[in-house]
Amino acid sequence: MLILTRRIGETLIIGDEITVTLLGIKGNQIRVGINAPKKISVHREEIYKKIQLEKKNLL
């Protein structure tokens, strides 16, 4: 796992098409903005796991 330190307003670039920007910090939560092409799905982990479980149950 790559671990990076960023300040509010700074951005990470993943590949050629994805950017992740640190928008703010409030208490123990951070806000991130993610720009990615529509062909790339972006989900919170708990939502992704729920989607995968639903797909598995349909088989």
Curated annotation (Swiss-Prot):
It is found in: Cytoplasm. Keywords: Activator, Cytoplasm, Repressor, RNA-binding, Translation regulation. The keyword Transport does not apply. One of its GO terms (cellular component) is cytosol. One of its GO terms (biological process) is mRNA catabolic process. The keyword Cytoplasm applies. A key translational regulator that binds mRNA to regulate translation initiation and/or mRNA stability. Mediates global changes in gene expression, shifting from rapid growth to stress survival by linking envelope stress, the stringent response and the catabolite repression systems. Usually binds in the 5'-UTR; binding at or near the Shine-Dalgarno sequence prevents ribosome-binding, repressing translation, binding elsewhere in the 5'-UTR can activate translation and/or stabilize the mRNA. Its function is antagonized by small RNA(s). Belongs to the CsrA/RsmA family. HAMAP family: CsrA (MF_00167). This is Translational regulator CsrA. It comes from Buchnera aphidicola subsp. Cinara cedri (strain Cc).
